[in-house]
């Protein structure tokens, strides 16, 4: 994915792109991290030539750095479910012919034996970025839109998970279509708590936000109390979720007082856009 594909990811853009915990990242900061990570992946090579690079990282600034860094270096990004069992990971890594795995901290520790057995290089985000020192900075390749960009694995409800491949052109078409349909602008602010190994979280929320210059607040899970506080404070003007999330939110209402429930409902009412997607919304819930 070329830099032009995400027009707000520029070195001179000081607007906030990501909020990850207590840290805000500007588009310029994110762009710099992506470039350094991409250069570190290349290690002096001109192009990754669709090398399959998996990552085991929850929604975070590191996740964005890895996804876009792999794209800019010419690889195929393979985000994995951080809740997957070893057997499922083994299947995904083997069937995708993964050569490198990116993971941090405890996630990295849990993958050491598996990656060693499969002869997959296991490195952290920081390791890759540090490898892009001033003496080893690689110019980034020009990526044709028809090249493969991402492989997502299905949920495996009928059989083992299957890898579904998207090209850079496909991703651009999906993102720009959704931006137009939902009238995304750089003034939008949205929370991301959906899984980032599925298309809803990756494309509908994260990619649309970054492409349009909006701000996304990153959560590794649906933290109802914390997100509810932000809804009351009018932090978000866009909210996208699956029906299960709305069910959990309604169940949460039973544990708090009615005044607080009303404040949360009023916060939703003030948003410009609420979406329930990826599955049918039950009539009773609607």
What are these regions (language model features)?
Residues 26-28, 149-176:
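Conserved AMP-binding A3 loop
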Residues 86, 117, 121-123, 220-286:
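Conserved adenylate-forming
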Residues 106-146, 253-256:
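ANL superfamily adenylate-forming
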Residues 82-114, 131-132, 174-191, 223-237:
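Conserved ATP-dependent adenylate/AMP-binding module captured primarily in the ANL superfamily
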Residues 135-153, 159-160, 183-189:
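Conserved pre-ATP/AMP-binding loop-to-beta segment of ANL
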Residues 23, 38-87:
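Conserved AMP-binding/adenylate-forming
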Residues 4-26, 44:
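AMP-dependent adenylate-forming
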